[in-house]
């Protein structure tokens, strides 16, 4: 129940109708997915997809990408809230960004903390 589950989604593939996109967005919204990686379809030479019609206008592809990124943000916020107060192991990276360091919990919640040399590349128990 505490797993962070992500999904990769491509928007704007040739032939994607408004109805297809709405059905996909509604399906994703109904699932216990924690976050999305949203990709906008782009043409690639020497692929069969170049022959599929109709081609989705790039502006509509970007609009659909934004809609799903907003959905992803909202899902991640809800997931983080559902983990509030839980103690999770966090792997902190060694990067010092303006006195801060970042890491990810074992269920993919991004954590920012004041930089501490002794935490570099270490797993620290952290209250979410």
Language-model segments: what does each one mean?
Residues 51-128:
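Terminal RNA-binding accessory module
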Residues 1-47, 67-75:
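Conserved C-terminal portion of the radical SAM core fold
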């Amino acid at each position: 129940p505490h797993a962070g589950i992500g999904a990769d989604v491509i928007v704007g593939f040739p032939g994607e109708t408004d109805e297809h996109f709405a059905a996909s967005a509604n399906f994703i919204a109904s699932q216990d997915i924690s976050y999305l990686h949203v990709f906008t379809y782009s043409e690639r030479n020497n692929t069969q997809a170049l022959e599929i019609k109709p081609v989705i206008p790039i502006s509509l592809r970007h609009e659909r990408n934004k809609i799903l990124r907003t959905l992803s943000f909202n899902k991640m916020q809800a997931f983080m809230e559902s983990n509030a107060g839980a103690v999770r192991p966090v792997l902190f990276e060694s990067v010092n960004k303006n006195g801060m360091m970042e890491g990810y919990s074992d269920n993919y919640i991004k954590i920012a903390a004041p930089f501490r040399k002794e935490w570099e590349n270490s797993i620290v128990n952290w209250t979410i």
